[in-house]
Amino acid sequence: MIIKRTPQAASPLASWLSYLENLHSKTIDLGLERVSQVAARLGVLKPAPFVFTVAGTNGKGTTCRTLESILMAAGYKVGVYSSPHLVRYTERVRVQGQELPESAHTASFAEIESARGDISLTYFEYGTLSALWLFKQAQLDVVILEVGLGGRLDATNIVDADVAVVTSIALDHTDWLGPDRESIGREKAGIFRSEKPAIVGEPEMPSTIADVAQEKSALLQRRGVEWNYSVTDHDWTFSDAHGTLENLPLPLVPQPNAATALAALRASGLEVSENAIRDGIASAILPGRFQIVSESPRVIFDVAHNPHAAEYLTGRMKALPKNGRVLAVIGMLHDKDIAGTLAWLKSVVDDWYCAPLEGPRGATAEQLLEHLGNGKSFDSVAQAWDAAMAGAKAEDTVLVCGSFHTVAHVMEVIDARRSGGK
């Protein structure tokens, strides 16, 4: 393996990212010993006075965004670490809702490079340490960490969470986390801490989560048991041991995730007014999550890439008033449950525009078509997008879905043409 010359603090971000991608022998190397050692050297194991850590198969990003939005509305200084990014690496770290300049990231990478010595780190471990270092520099009140993969052995778990959250449990990453919901639940519950709140948004919670909570003496708070919510056409109600909040504004993010965020917030003991809760819920939005970007034709971006997310997306699509046809631009990774994901989407999609994703994990357009029976194949996401938009009438809907990569490609095409005047 050839490792490129080490970049410097002033080197471009792209040079650093290329270096990080080739630094470690494995893309994923679960375990906390190496990354903990470097974190201790950097002094970043406590990045802020209060930390939320959020795990789950789906819903992590929007749960984090809702927490962030409410806490900022309440006047807290907040940092969020999330992954993967859609278009820019800098999306992964937000301070007060804003991305940091590339120079901040490269400065953090240089600090980590100096501190790690001969300890090898994966791309994600490096990114996690970078986020923690940036948060420490920013002198925040609250940090929200989104788990990358699983929980127990994820790099984010080097930090002791004051409140741990598991949003949902479904089959994904089974090669790493185990073959069933019970195994996956145990891995995700690995973020729980003794005598600290452990919030579970999954309504059908695997028993292993309760087992881990008991083993760790965590304060388990389950949806439908310790807290719950109900929804009408125009508002929703939340209830827990602290009381009931009524007439809450309907969120722009998935309802279960907004409720899970609220459960975590109320368990935290942080002082937040009811007005801040309402304002934060109303303003929380995350790109690529049922994001309606235009009308006539309506264009929707959604990163749904497994059956659980596709089921939710299908429900949202069915709830929309339907006038014309639904044209789907889709690309997926071959290690996802392609058949299970497409089985849900088939009920709402009329025309398929299938594209390959690059890299060793990318599925070909032909692999997608095997599960569809009909549809068109293209050489790239950009070509599929152009064809769908050319074929869409004003009353139609163009849905871009299947992967973060698919949505990101289309976003990049739109941005490039906008900046190029096309």
Regions found by a protein language model. Name each.
Residues 1-27:
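Charged, amphipathic alpha-helical linker segments immediately N-terminal to NTP-binding catalytic cores
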Residues 119, 141, 146, 161-244, ...:
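Acidic, Mg2+-coordinating active-site environments of NTP-dependent enzymes
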Residues 12, 26-28, 32-49, 73-159, ...:
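ATP-dependent carboxylate-amine ligase catalytic core
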Residues 403:
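Active-site-proximal loop/hinge segments that shape catalytic or ion-binding/gating pockets
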Residues 81-84, 200-202, 214-231, 248-252, ...:
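Beta-strand->loop->alpha-helix junctions that form or flank phosphate-binding loops
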Residues 48-50, 137, 142-147, 154-165, ...:
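Nucleotide phosphate-binding/pyrophosphate-handling subdomain across enzymes
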Residues 199, 203-220, 230-235, 266, ...:
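C-terminal helical cap/extension that packs against the catalytic core
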Residues 50-54, 62-79:
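A conserved segment at the C-terminal end of the G1
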